[in-house]
């Protein structure tokens, strides 16, 4: 079963699919090894890990596809992949969908921001017209080859134009053929409940630590009607703090010996990365030497 079909199966059989965010292939491998349902490839995290820059639309489609391919290979579970605005108009979206599908992702996320886009919890976002985004969604739906490959439409209208506009767009995007609707940055549980009372089908909740939406437990999100929860920032925030603490300790203490209890061991890391499997392959296919 391909990962897109697996994702559809998960959504049809589970009440809640939890997808932690991966900012690189190593993170995706850890998430998959820990038994989570899916991985979310975060554009926010790709900008930071690949460029050392904030999420303001600097990555190209080619760069994002390469990152998606590596994350898919490492994860071993379905990948929901951020594709920003689709990198242009409906014509650009068609190529983006083809490339993401070939990369093996299960779900592509397209949003209705104006290029260059910004993180969905930053101020200063602008959105395209509802009609333009509907056209882009229709182009995405018509372009996919595998019918199990899912199109997720995100609207950033809540912050720029209010919850009513966001709901109107969510309904329009669903009618245009989107499989999953993602209304970004609702402000409070009442708005979150209203989203799920209004939008038919699958909906996604975005849990950003320090963002505009309250952090709720997955059981609470499920009770509100959500089907998928993503955690796009948690891994990279924890990793960043750990690195700051580590290198501060080295600068102050002239050694890393004092922070070894915060690290995985050499063997633990190699096990997580799958070294034993590589050794088995080397043994099975080794020629005489």
Curated annotation (Swiss-Prot):
Catalytic activity: (2R,3S)-2,3-dimethylmalate = propanoate + pyruvate
Cofactor(s), names only, from the UniProt record: Mg(2+)
Uppermost EC category: lyase
EC numbers: 4.1.3.32
Keyword annotations: Lyase, Magnesium, Metal-binding
GO function term, MF aspect, one: metal ion binding
Gene Ontology biological process terms in this record: nicotinate catabolic process
Pathways per UniProt: Cofactor degradation; nicotinate degradation; propanoate and pyruvate from 6-hydroxynicotinate: step 8/8
Pfam family, one: PEP_mutase
Cystines in this chain: none
Description of how activity is regulated: Completely inhibited by propionic anhydride and by cystamine. Irreversibly inhibited by the mercapto reagents iodoacetate and iodoacetamide. Unaffected by hydroxylamine.
Subunit structure and binding partners: Homotetramer.
PANTHER family to which the protein is assigned, alphabetical: CARBOXYVINYL-CARBOXYPHOSPHONATE PHOSPHORYLMUTASE, CHLOROPLASTIC (PTHR42905:SF5), PHOSPHOENOLPYRUVATE CARBOXYLASE (PTHR42905)
Family membership: Belongs to the isocitrate lyase/PEP mutase superfamily.
Function, as annotated: Catalyzes the formation of proponate and pyruvate from (2R,3S)-2,3-dimethylmalate. Has no activity toward dimethylmaleate, malate, citramalate, isocitrate and citrate.
Protein's UniProt name: 2,3-dimethylmalate lyase
Organism: Eubacterium barkeri
């Amino acid at each position: 079963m391909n990962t897109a079909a697996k994702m559809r199966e998960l959504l049809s059989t589970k009440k809640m699919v939890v997808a932690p965010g991966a900012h690189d292939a190593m993170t995706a491998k850890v998430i998959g090894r820990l038994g989570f349902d899916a991985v979310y490839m975060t554009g926010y995290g790709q900008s930071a890990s690949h460029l050392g820059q904030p999420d303001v639309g600097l990555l190209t489609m080619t760069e994002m596809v390469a990152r998606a391919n590596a994350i898919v290979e490492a994860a071993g579970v379905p990948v929901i992949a951020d594709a920003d605005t689709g990198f242009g108009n409906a014509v650009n979206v068609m190529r983006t969908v083809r490339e993401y599908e070939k990369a093996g992702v299960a779900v592509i996320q397209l949003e209705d921001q104006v290029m260059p886009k910004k993180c969905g919890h930053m101020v200063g976002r602008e959105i395209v017209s509802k009609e333009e985004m509907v056209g882009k969604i229709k182009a995405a739906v018509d372009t996919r080859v595998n019918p199990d490959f899912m199109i997720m439409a995100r609207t950033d209208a809540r912050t720029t134009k209010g919850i009513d506009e966001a709901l109107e767009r969510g309904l329009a995007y669903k009618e245009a053929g989107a499989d999953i609707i993602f209304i970004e940055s609702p402000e409070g549980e009442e708005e979150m409940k209203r989203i799920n009372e209004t939008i038919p089908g699958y909906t996604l909740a975005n849990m950003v630590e320090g963002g505009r939406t309250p952090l709720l437990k997955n059981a609470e999100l499920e009770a509100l009607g959500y089907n998928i929860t993503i955690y796009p920032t948690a891994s990279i925030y924890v990793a960043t703090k750990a690195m700051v603490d580590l290198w501060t300790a080295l600068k102050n203490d002239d050694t890393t010996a004092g922070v070894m209890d915060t690290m995985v061991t050499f063997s633990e890391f190699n096990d997580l990365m799958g070294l034993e499997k590589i050794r088995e392959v080397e043994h099975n296919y080794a020629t005489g030497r």
